[in-house]
A protein has these predicted regions:
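Membrane-embedded catalytic cores of phosphoryl/pyrophosphoryl-handling enzymes
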Residues: 106-225
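Membrane-water interface at transmembrane helix exits
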Residues: 51-55, 77, 81-90, 134, ...
């Protein structure tokens, strides 16, 4: 038991070290950018583009089931993290004022999040979406973009001081499990068979990319003007 506890403490210490190595690399420009990137509503245009791809490639009934599947994936991921796991693990966020390291943590706009952060809902939700789309389309560049998008979301949470890397890894696993389960349920219910040729998959990449460019410009304006 002692050896197990020592190993666990070693992982916690490593997690904290990695957290600080990321959180300490900050400046005003990226404070604005990461804060904007970590937002939820700013990604609505990209979500609309994903819906557009479904509408252009699937029957409306399949599209409806896809949207329900995505909603269930995100609901599962969010509830698994916030309701089922966090109250039992009770790992405080690094930014929480009751955490001894909180005074050394760089935060943005005085945002500290809730009390507990393991697992990360942001990681679970974004990777749940990313993995569901991977299972659904299996398109290389869309997969690369959406996985990079989810990964940068995770990075932003450490940068903003509200999550340890371990929180994000656990959230990613929750998102993967949720996406895998709901996708296979979706296939069983809808009889979905992946089409050989899927069109308009660049739409989410374009809209998501333009959104990121907009954030970069916004951060520049707030920093230098």
């Amino acid at each position: 038991m002692t050896a197990l506890m020592d190993a666990l403490q070693g992982l916690i210490d490593l997690d904290t070290d990695i957290f600080f190595s990321i959180n300490r690399m900050h400046n005003t420009y990226f404070d604005y950018f990461m804060n904007a990137y970590s937002g939820k509503w700013v990604w609505i245009p990209m979500y609309a583009a994903i819906w557009y791809v479904m509408l252009r490639n699937f029957h409306w009934k399949v599209t409806l089931l896809c949207m329900i599947g995505l909603a269930l994936t995100i609901t599962f991921a969010d509830q698994a993290c916030a309701t089922w796991i966090r109250p039992y693990v009770e790992r405080m966020r690094p930014s929480n004022l009751d955490n001894p390291i909180s005074e050394m943590v760089h935060i943005v706009n005085n945002h500290r999040g809730g009390r507990y952060g393991f697992p990360s809902c942001h990681a679970a939700n974004t990777f749940g979406l990313a993995f569901f789309l991977f299972f659904l389309f299996r398109k290389r560049w869309l997969t690369v973009f959406i996985m990079a998008w989810a990964l940068l979301t995770c990075y932003s949470r450490v940068y903003l001081g509200v999550h340890y890397p371990g929180d994000l890894l656990a959230g990613t696993i929750v998102g993967l499990i949720g996406a895998w389960l709901i996708y296979h349920l979706f296939v069983k219910v809808s009889g979905y068979k992946r089409a050989a040729h899927v069109t308009h998959v660049n739409a989410p990449i374009l809209i998501g990319g333009l959104t990121i460019v907009g954030m970069l410009v916004y951060a520049g304006i707030r920093t230098f003007l």
